Amino acid sequence: MAARTRSLVERRRVLMAGVRSHTRFYKALAEEVREFHATKICGTLLTLLSGSLQGRSVFEATRVTLICEVDLGPRRPDCICVFEFANDKTLGGVCVIIELKTCKYISSGDTASKREQRATGMKQLRHSLKLLQSLAPPGDKIVYLCPVLVFVAQRTLRVSRVTRLVPQKVSGNITAVVRMLQSLSTYTVPIEPRTQRARRRRGGAARGSASRPKRSHSGARDPPESAARQLPPADQTPTSTEGGGVLKRIAALFCVPVATKTKPRAASE
């Protein structure tokens, strides 16, 4: 009984690790799609998927859409990345059907577990391909359905193996295909808005600068206010005798006595 309980716990732990790896993969790929639209920079995962674009360049795509956990009824492919080619006269787009398999160690070679995963993944992809062929909305342009099996490491998401099945060609409307797949999606990747990320970075920088003492441009610390406000002692306050000294010298020439003018000292409390 105890051994059976441990086995169930271990299976659940492995399953949850795989689920976490899947969601992290979706997030990483969605981030690359967003950056591609904003900057036309193609990330690692998009570059990998571009090998299924039937000779087209990823930079020819007018739009890239990632749709996760598509419910096709009997099957639910992990994600489908759709590349639209609106400027092409014959090609409407390419749907890359991705089945993801995770492994704890990618350096362990071709183990029995990986062979089983590969056989299962290929079967799942063929099933998903048939379902999509029957569900694709009709149209007058070519749409390629390209199944891809991807092995990644659970922690690093490093891709260790990619297997591409023979693509299938159908006549369809790629815009309608995207709408259909989005309506069947059961998982949406939570993407943090750019403004929120920038606001958090600015807040962290402000908190860091507030904790450090302010320095002047010369690199020295600002003098304390008490030192700036110090006044000389009362007994060292000079008397104003500038005018008296000049008059004394003039009066000495004519032998006329002149009184010295001094300012009264402030009375100390």
Curated annotation (Swiss-Prot):
Region (Disordered): 191-244
Compartments, as annotated in UniProt: Virion; Host cytoplasm; Host nucleus, Host nucleolus; Host Golgi apparatus
Keyword Iron annotated: no
Magnesium in keyword set: no
Cellular component, GO annotation: host cell Golgi apparatus; host cell nucleolus; virion component
Main location: virion
Keywords: Host cytoplasm, Host Golgi apparatus, Host nucleus, Virion
Consequence when changing residue 191 to M: In strain: Nonneuroinvasive mutant HF10
One Pfam family from the record: Herpes_UL24
Cystine pairings recorded for this chain: none
Entry's induction text: Expressed late in the infection cycle.
Organism domain of life: Viruses
Known function: May participate in nuclear egress of viral particles. Plays a role in the dispersal of several host nucleolar proteins including NCL/nucleolin and NPM1. Since deletion of host NCL/nucleolin negatively impact on nuclear egress, UL24 supposedly acts on this process through its effect on host nucleoli.
UniProt record similarity statement: Belongs to the herpesviridae UL24 family.
Record-given protein name: Protein UL24
